[in-house]
């Protein structure tokens, strides 16, 4: 869909070495302009609201000053469900956690439909921090809501 509010109740992973995320993304990252807007949980209570924008000038990471910090109290991201939201309007993107605005990006011209995606991955850059005895360390999704 084009524009809307995307929200989910998520318990993020507790340990580093892998990442859980909620994202809205375009269909084809080879067609510009393209954007992916994400909530990422990287373990140890670190959360990152951010976006990656591609245009004819290249790739631009749009990170908040809160990105990669402990936005919630210790243990909250991995021990309980929290509500993560991304609002997409014709004026830009806004990230929320438990109803509180955390990050905002204005004036990104994207008018193509995007999809909502949840992933749990281990990137090559994360692998050195992965401790196998801490697995399983899943992300859990309680519910998902999408508004136009």
Model-derived features with residue positions:
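GH16 jelly-roll
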Residues: 1-148
């Amino acid at each position: 869909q084009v524009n809307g509010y995307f929200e989910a109740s998520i318990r993020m992973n507790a340990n580093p070495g892998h990442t859980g995320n909620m994202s809205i993304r375009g269909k084809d990252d080879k067609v510009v302009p393209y954007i992916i807007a994400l909530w990422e949980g990287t373990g140890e209570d670190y959360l990152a609201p951010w976006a990656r924008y591609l245009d004819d000038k290249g790739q631009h990471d749009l990170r908040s000053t809160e990105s990669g910090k402990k936005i919630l109290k210790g243990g909250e991201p991995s021990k309980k469900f929290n509500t993560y939201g991304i609002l997409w309007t014709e004026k830009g993107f806004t990230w929320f956690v438990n109803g509180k605005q955390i990050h905002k990006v204005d004036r990104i011209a994207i008018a193509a439909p995007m999809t909502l995606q949840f992933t749990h991955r281990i990137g090559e850059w994360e692998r050195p921090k992965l401790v196998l005895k801490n697995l399983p360390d899943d992300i859990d999704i309680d519910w998902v809501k999408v508004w136009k």
